């Protein structure tokens, strides 16, 4: 830990307060974040927790040392949506093979997309299908302890039975009673449930569906419920390698430091995770600190396919910055668009709702262009240590105050403090050394062009277009092309308004 490191403080959803972070073991800081269900392209709402907790991962590594931090983010590869996609996309294949194709291709795309957003790989990415043994063992323990029961080849968890015992109470995270949660929840009504709030730990597989040997003496094949998957995977990757798990009676060894995810997961998913893990492992807490990022809207509206504003990460990388055009290496183009998307998201505090707009994305790309231009001009090299990132680190140590961190970067740019700018960008995952050192990056061919003059001529052309004076509009376009500046017209996908971008050609 750096001697001058500020005190890290994080908002804990469990206590509803900002707390000084005190790891269970400073030489083994552990964090779990709920990851993707791999059945379709990830959307920009999925990108937000990936970026938020990547920044926290980087900060923890900066404060405690990279070798002392373990970050687990799961991959859910058992789900009804996966089954439906497999049946739709590969009707002629055996079902298990179709499922494998869906999960492998979708996961590969997810990994490529989030890498383009500037994220580090987590330490481990457990897949649900690799941890069936742990799930069955946890379920057996819960049945033995009287908080789960078998009914019609299902195993269900009973929140009422949990609350009848000594120890943590169901609803502590959401801060609602069972009656309040029942009133506000969409719960499956099934005859085999003892109580409406009981939730599935294991269920029988339907004919043709993937299935595994069942726990609790059930003879038919089955598959896990969603919530038990995360309890089992976090135990397998953050507890068992370090002496915890079902064979350990030490409550401290059966807790980890931080659990993260989107605000939509507080109930029922995270509430159910806590119930399962605490009852199975005999702890008061599953994780000491629970962190949740806020919702995302698109151009002021809820993102949905019905509104036509559903945007995937791949959409942003391919089309979010149309001025990029086609590069010789579109992987590099994706990385630039990904950094712009990352900066755009980090301009809103992680706990606040975010409004995704095409304008902010474009503005973020322009700001990155200025920052990288300074780094290129001054010959900045990839830093081995972040000894000049103290202002950014101090901001992030205040509950990941990314806006204050970006303000520090802007100040460093203003005074041309290249070390503080570059190292601060690195700490936030905004520094890609390629864009500092490469000589053939198309966007930096703009450096010798008068951007303000071009913007004025584009505005003049737009006035002619609005007046339907096509001849004058075409004249400006052609004159700019003769000067080596090519215009490209497109529409804002959310508003339908004309967007004109430009690039240097020839």
Swiss-Prot record:
It is found in: Cytoplasm. It comes from the Bacteria. One of its GO terms (molecular function) is zinc ion binding. CDD domains: CysRS_core. Zn(2+) binds at residues 34, 230, 269, 273. One of its GO terms (cellular component) is cytosol. Its cofactor is Zn(2+). Its main location: cytoplasm. Keywords: Aminoacyl-tRNA synthetase, ATP-binding, Cytoplasm, Ligase, Metal-binding, Nucleotide-binding, Protein biosynthesis, Zinc. Its EC number is 6.1.1.16. It is an enzyme of class 6 (ligase). ATP binds at residue 305. GO terms for biological process: cysteinyl-tRNA aminoacylation. InterPro entries: Cys-tRNA-ligase, Cys-tRNA/MSH_ligase, Rossmann-like_a/b/a_fold, tRNA-synt_1_cat_dom, tRNAsynth_Ia_anticodon-bd. A motif ('KMSKS' region) lies at residues 302-306. It catalyses: tRNA(Cys) + L-cysteine + ATP = L-cysteinyl-tRNA(Cys) + AMP + diphosphate. A motif ('HIGH' region) lies at residues 36-46. The keyword Magnesium does not apply. NCBIfam families: cysS (TIGR00435). Belongs to the class-I aminoacyl-tRNA synthetase family. Monomer. This is Cysteine--tRNA ligase. It comes from Brucella suis (strain ATCC 23445 / NCTC 10510).
């Amino acid at each position: 830990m750096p001697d001058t490191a500020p005190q890290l403080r994080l908002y804990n959803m469990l206590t509803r307060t900002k707390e000084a972070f005190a790891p269970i073991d400073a030489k083994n800081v552990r964090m779990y974040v709920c990851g993707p269900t791999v059945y379709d392209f990830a959307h920009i709402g999925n990108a937000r927790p990936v970026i938020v907790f990547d920044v926290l991962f980087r900060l923890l590594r900066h404060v405690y040392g990279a070798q002392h931090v373990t970050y687990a983010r799961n991959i859910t590869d058992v789900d009804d949506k996966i089954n439906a996609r497999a049946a739709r996309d590969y009707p002629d294949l055996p079902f298990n093979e179709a499922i494998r194709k869906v999960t492998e291709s979708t996961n590969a795309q997810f990994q490529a997309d989030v890498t383009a957003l500037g994220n580090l790989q987590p330490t481990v990415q457990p897949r649900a299908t690799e941890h069936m043994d742990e799930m069955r063992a946890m379920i057996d323990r819960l049945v033995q302890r009287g908080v789960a029961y078998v009914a019609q080849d299902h195993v269900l968890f009973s929140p009422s039975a949990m609350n009848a015992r000594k120890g943590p109470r169901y609803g502590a995270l959401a801060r609602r009673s069972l009656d309040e949660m029942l009133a506000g929840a969409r719960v499956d009504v099934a005859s085999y449930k003892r109580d409406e709030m009981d939730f599935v730990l294991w269920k029988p597989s339907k004919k043709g569906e993937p299935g595994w040997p069942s726990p609790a003496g059930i003879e038919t094949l089955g598959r896990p419920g969603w919530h038990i998957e995360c309890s089992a995977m976090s135990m397998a990757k953050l507890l068992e390698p370090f002496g915890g798990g079902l064979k350990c009676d030490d409550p401290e060894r059966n807790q980890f430091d931080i659990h993260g995810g989107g605000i939509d997961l507080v109930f029922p998913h995270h509430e159910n995770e806590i119930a399962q893990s605490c009852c199975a492992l005999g702890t008061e807490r599953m994780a000491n600190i629970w962190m949740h990022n806020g919702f995302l809207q698109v151009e002021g509206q809820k993102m949905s396919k019905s509104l036509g504003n559903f945007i995937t990460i791949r959409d942003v990388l391919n089309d979010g910055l149309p001025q990029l055009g086609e590069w010789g290496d579109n992987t590099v183009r994706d990385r630039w668009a990904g950094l712009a998307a990352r900066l755009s998201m980090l301009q809103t505090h992680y706990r606040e709702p975010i409004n995704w707009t095409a304008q902010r994305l474009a503005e973020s790309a322009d700001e990155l262009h200025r920052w990288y231009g300074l780094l290129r001009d001054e010959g900045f090299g990839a830093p081995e240590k972040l000894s000049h990132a103290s202002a950014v680190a101090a901001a992030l140590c205040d509950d990941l105050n990314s806006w204050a961190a970006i303000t520090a970067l802007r100040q460093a740019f203003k005074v041309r403090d290249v070390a503080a700018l570059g190292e601060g960008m690195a700490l936030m995952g905004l520094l890609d050394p390629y864009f500092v050192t490469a000589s053939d990056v198309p966007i930096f061919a703009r450096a010798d062009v008068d951007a303000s003059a071009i913007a004025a001529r584009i505005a003049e052309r737009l006035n002619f277009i609005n007046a339907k004076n096509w001849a004058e509009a075409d004249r400006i376009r052609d004159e700019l092309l003769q000067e080596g500046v090519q215009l490209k017209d497109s529409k804002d996908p959310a508003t339908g308004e004309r967007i004109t971008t430009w690039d240097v050609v020839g």
